Regions:
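GT-A fold catalytic core of metal-dependent nucleotide-sugar glycosyltransferases
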Residues: 82-127
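Short beta-strand/loop segment that forms part of the nucleotide-sugar
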Residues: 31-41, 52-53
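Short beta-strand-to-loop element that shapes/binds the nucleotide-sugar donor at the catalytic cleft/hinge
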Residues: 124-140
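Catalytic core and acceptor-binding pocket of nucleotide-sugar-dependent glycosyltransferases
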Residues: 144-285, 289-290
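C-terminal non-catalytic accessory extensions
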Residues: 265-322
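Short, acidic, metal-binding catalytic loop of nucleotide-sugar glycosyltransferases
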Residues: 22-32
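Active-site-proximal specificity loops/subdomain of glycosyltransferases
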Residues: 42-92
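N-proximal low-complexity "stem/linker" segments adjacent to membrane-targeting elements
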Residues: 1-20
């Protein structure tokens, strides 16, 4: 079996539902997680290792790998450095066939059921989104992020020297590099990404997700994860590799079988009864969510513009001093 390690950095107060995340990691006992953190994680599963590091120590570690001065003022900016983790933390991943990174606002299902050795053998990169991405652990793959994209994307030096979030771990960065180099990316639609703009269980629609249904939920059942929805009079059940829920909290409180609802986690003892699930939504909700999403994108653009102006003014100030 090919060995997999997932590298993460987490600084500051832990999420309220961090034990939900840890429990789903524990069920994937044949995959290792390595977390650099300044928090106290208590007892963790055998396959989850915590290395105590401060944010400044990680910043110094990253800086030591590059000759130019990097910009890394907040932990959130680490998302742009994730494609370089195989290069930055190379001494920790030597014995593994694949390394990767993931988010903490998610729950894993049976990862190995989807990512078999046959699939890992055929592909250079697994998935395109930052929720969960894996890379073949070779010297060539681990330094591929350094390749200049020209007009096809953002150069890593530009990404690593600005406060602006460039989403280098997704479409405008590492994925474009892999595609330009004819590297094979596995991107089957086997996960669920929940909308951050709705209290209800609303699935974000893109190339990797399903259509929404009037009654739908996600079920965690002792390490297995399912997308369950009602279509006409039929209840359908599809196994998924993970669910990502940005902007939401799902504290399972140690339960081994539960569903996700708009009010949090709901314990399941027998079969799902839709009348007892507070999860129905109207399609008008989706339209409202689209407006919220547009507003969110506008705010991000304004924030990035302000960040760029501050950098330009700082450079002008330094030039004046000289």
């Amino acid at each position: 079996m090919k060995k997999i390690i997932i590298v993460c950095c987490y600084f500051g107060q832990k999420r309220k539902d961090y034990k939900t995340w840890l429990k789903s990691c524990e069920y994937n006992s044949n995959i290792d997680w390595l977390i650099f953190s300044d928090s106290d994680w208590g007892n963790t599963p055998p396959n989850v290792k915590i290395i105590k590091k401060t944010f400044n120590e990680i910043k110094e570690k990253i800086q030591s790998k590059f000759e130019f001065k990097i910009t890394l003022n907040t932990p959130y900016k680490l998302c742009d450095y994730k494609p370089a983790y195989g290069y930055i933390f190379e001494e920790y991943i030597e014995e593994y066939d694949f390394w990767g990174y993931c988010d903490f606002d998610m729950i894993f299902g049976d990862i190995r059921k989807f990512l078999t050795d046959e699939i890992l053998q055929q592909y250079d990169k697994i998935f395109k989104l930052g929720h969960l991405s894996l890379y073949k652990n070779t010297p060539g793959s681990n330094t591929l992020f350094k390749q200049d994209l020209g007009n096809y994307g953002t150069n890593y030096k530009e990404v690593f020297t600005t406060n602006e979030i460039k989403v280098f771990d997704e479409k405008q960065g590492i994925n474009s590099i892999y595609e330009l180099n004819n590297k094979k990316i596995y991107n089957e639609p086997c996960f669920i990404n929940l909308s951050k703009f709705s209290k209800q269980i609303v699935v974000v629609r893109n190339e990797n997700t399903k259509n929404n249904h009037s009654c739908q939920t996600v079920l965690f059942d002792q390490g297995k994860l399912y997308y369950i929805y009602k279509e006409k009079e039929n209840i359908n059940k599809e196994e998924i590799i993970y669910v990502h829920f940005s902007g939401k909290t799902f504290d399972s409180n140690g339960e081994e079988k539960y569903i996700l609802t708009q009010n949090g986690v709901q314990k399941v003892e027998k079969d799902i009864e839709w009348k007892k699930i507070d999860n129905n939504f109207l399609w008008i909700t989706l339209k409202i969510n689209k407006l919220k999403k547009i507003n969110f994108k506008i705010k991000r653009k304004i924030k990035n513009y302000i960040s760029r102006r501050e950098e330009i003014n700082e450079r002008k100030k330094q030039e004046t001093i000289k």
